[in-house]
């Protein structure tokens, strides 16, 4: 059974499963509220695979965030929501931009995090990731919503022909985001992200693909080296998006959460 709830500051959340809490921080989505339709179905399928003996609270961004927001701002929102809801530190997980926020929460507010799982992320963006996210951000800021998401394709695909075909397909997207200001806020925050990893006290699992163009291998390895208690799982041949399809992805997370 999935429960909808609202955390401190109006932060939307969905709760999956029963047991001790794990907070999952969502990546950049077009709406500030909980996902609906296919996005919700995808989230449900993914998180249900991790609900063994725990409740996963999937949380979105706080409504009202604007351009110029920093990663520290987003991390403070999450930490405050955690401590007001649970009155104690909890397990925290994030993917992509959500993973960047999770790293920042663990660095800034060690009192809010017991264990950390950060997937498809690093302490900062690589050059390709920074460029494509700036392009995406600028399109949103200009109100050029049609096909705006195609700006991210060079971060997903490295070969020219597949990149060209996917760009053409994504350019057909005619949807209008419900909360473009919030998307811009998250993109601004990650653009300036530079996590002080040495301050992360929680045991940390980093998962990444060795072909991730947003957060390339060297940055991921630097992140793992700088976190005092980090375990790195680097999946060969996986990129930013398809890292979740690796057969080891969910088992590695479950083992880390259960055994550490």
Where are these regions (language model features)?
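Catalytic histidine-centered segment of alpha/beta-hydrolase-like enzymes
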Residues: 238-251
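Conserved alpha/beta-hydrolase catalytic His-Asp/Glu region
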Residues: 127-130, 146-191, 196
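Catalytic histidine neighborhood in serine/cysteine hydrolases
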Residues: 221-241
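Conserved alpha/beta-hydrolase "acid-adjacent" motif
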Residues: 213-219
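Flexible "cap/lid" loop of the alpha/beta hydrolase fold
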Residues: 100-103, 107, 114-143
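Conserved acidic catalytic loop of the alpha/beta-hydrolase fold
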Residues: 73-90
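Conserved HGGG/HGGXW glycine-rich cap/lid loop of the alpha/beta-hydrolase fold
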Residues: 5-65
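Short beta-strand/loop motif that positions the catalytic acidic residue
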Residues: 200, 206-208, 212
């Amino acid at each position: 059974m999935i429960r909808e709830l609202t955390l401190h500051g109006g932060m939307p959340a969905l709760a999956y499963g029963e047991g001790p809490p794990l907070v999952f921080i969502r990546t950049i989505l077009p709406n500030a509220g909980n996902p609906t339709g296919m996005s919700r179905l995808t989230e449900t399928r993914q998180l249900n695979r991790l609900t063994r003996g725990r409740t996963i609270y999937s949380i979105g961004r706080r409504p009202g965030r604007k351009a110029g927001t920093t990663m520290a701002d987003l991390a403070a929102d999450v930490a405050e929501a955690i401590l007001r809801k649970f009155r104690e530190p909890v397990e925290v997980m994030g993917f992509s931009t959500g993973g960047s926020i999770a790293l920042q929460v663990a660095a800034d507010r060690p009192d809010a995090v017991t264990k950390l799982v950060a997937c498809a992320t690093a302490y900062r963006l690589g050059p390709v990731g920074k460029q494509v996210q700036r392009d995406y951000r600028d399109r949103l800021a200009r109100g050029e919503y049609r096909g705006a998401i195609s700006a991210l394709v060079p971060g997903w695909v490295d070969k020219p022909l597949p990149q060209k075909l996917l760009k053409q397909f994504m350019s057909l997207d005619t949807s209008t985001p419900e909360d473009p200001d919030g998307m811009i806020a998250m993109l601004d925050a990650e653009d300036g992200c530079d996590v002080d990893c040495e301050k992360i006290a929680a045991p940390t699992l980093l998962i990444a693909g060795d072909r991730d163009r947003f957060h390339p291998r060297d940055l991921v390895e630097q992140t793992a080296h700088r976190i005092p208690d980090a375990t790195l799982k680097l999946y060969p041949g996986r990129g930013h998006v398809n890292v979740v399809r690796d057969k080891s992805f969910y088992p590695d997370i479950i083992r880390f959460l259960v055994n550490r």
